[in-house]
Amino acid sequence: MSQNSITSYKMGFAKHFFLFAVLLCATAMYSVAEPAQERLIESIACMQKGLPCMEHVDCCHGVCDSLFCLY
């Protein structure tokens, strides 16, 4: 192998490794951010009374009656 082909091989490996690292970090950030975003939305929804609901668990410790949350 010539010096140019070795350098080219190393650069190709570095680019693939960097891309893999970026994708891995993005996946980890997404998996952490999604539950936090859901908790934030749920906490905001819990502060509002009279929201539509289907079950008691939809009402954040309230009671679902006639498709609306009662507190």
Curated annotation (Swiss-Prot):
Keywords: Disulfide bond, Ion channel impairing toxin, Knottin, Neurotoxin, Secreted, Signal, Toxin. GO terms for cellular component: extracellular region. Residues 34-39 form a propeptide. It is found in: Secreted. Expressed by the venom gland. Disulfide bonds join C46-C60, C53-C64, C59-C69. It comes from the Eukaryota. Residues 1-33 form the signal peptide. The keyword Secreted applies. GO terms for molecular function: ion channel regulator activity; toxin activity. Coiled coil: none annotated. The keyword Repressor does not apply. The presence of a 'disulfide through disulfide knot' structurally defines this protein as a knottin. Probable insect neurotoxin with ion channel impairing activity. Does not show activity on 45 human receptors from 9 families (5-hydroxytryptamine, adrenergic, dopamine, muscarinic, histamine, neurotransmitter, opioid, sigma, and gaba(A) receptors). In vivo, when mixed with U3-SYTX-Sth1a does not cause paralytic or lethal activity when injected into crickets. It is noteworthy that crickets are evolutionarily distant from prey species. This is U3-scytotoxin-Sth1h. It comes from Scytodes thoracica.
